[in-house]
């Protein structure tokens, strides 16, 4: 992978699909060799998908990013978006409820503690002023599994 020029292009969407669409369209027109997008905001890949389809580049441009199954389903199923990355909010919620229960019960929260959900069986503790509990439960949606999720 290489940058398309010596400066990193700004495609900040400010969480707006229309802005992501306009930025993606600008980048695609200015850089015909552009091979892919990755979106960090939840709406980025929607705008990128719209621009890619409009310009007839779905077979040339790969799109991967953050989103939800219901918002991205059409684009994933038609092949415009290659993968959607996220966390299952239900699993994360159950894990955090288990963590809250353990804290309230006075249990010691230590490295490797099991919070009873896939990806949270052996969490990592990040020490510091804002102590964090980190799980490892990415959910990668593609044409094979996107219909398994409805949110």
Where do the protein language model's features map onto the residues?
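A residue-level marker of the well-folded mature domains of exported/periplasmic proteins
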Residues: 1-151
